[in-house]
Amino acid sequence: MHGFKGNLGYDDSKILYALSHYLNQQGISTLRFDFDGTSHSDGEFKDMTVFSEILDGMKIIDYAHTTMQAKKIYLIGHSQGGVVALMLAAYYSDIITKLVLLAPAATLKDDALKGVCQGSQYDPNHIPETVDVHGFTVGGDYFRTAQLLPIYETAQHYSGPTLLIHGLADNVVSPEASKKYNVIMPNSELHLIPGEGHMFNGSRRQEILKLVANFLKN
């Protein structure tokens, strides 16, 4: 599950594209998609919220579980997609076998309370109808709902095996977010990768791909 302003990954520069193809080579089937309002999906980006992405994710889980009849379902989320994936794993703890979180953006709630979003600023007490974030029109409902998201509270309801990977050079989402997840989720393991940024485009990407594959296979 991709992050804020992201997509499912259409070339090898994107971590989800690289990870999907690597897992396929390891015999693990993958299902990637664009959230509603992003890239090739229908809808408007300004209507996107974490809740709308959770609803999208529910449809994907239903498709994998009911239509594809997958015996095991693993969720992988990057950045905001990590927040969505974890909340879905908690909601579907009886279905989701394992969870992988890549630089999960739990800090989006703190940012919304401060009135900041990737460099853009707004009044958090009087949220405007829309906010421009690097050329993307983000609806006010995104920030209103983000301020009250029960991110860590929900995380405590998933007890399945969880892999947390965060780059120590991430200047978008602080590694402290993954550290906190690791503390409140006793069945989780945390890998902090020196030199890797938020997009995992550094020299240690292959190591990250292997970490995920080994975690899912074992």
Model-derived regions: residue spans:
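Short, surface-exposed "cap/lid" segments of acyl-processing enzymes
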Residues: 1-25, 30-34
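Alpha/beta-hydrolase active-site loop signature
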Residues: 5, 35-39, 106, 197
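Aromatic pocket-lining residues of Rossmann-like dinucleotide-binding sites
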Residues: 23, 88-89
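Glycine-rich "HGGG/HGxG" loop immediately N-terminal to the catalytic nucleophile
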Residues: 34-48
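Alpha/beta-hydrolase active-site loop
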Residues: 47-67
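Alpha/beta-hydrolase fold nucleophile elbow
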Residues: 68-79
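The alpha/beta-hydrolase serine catalytic core
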Residues: 74, 83, 90, 95-180, ...
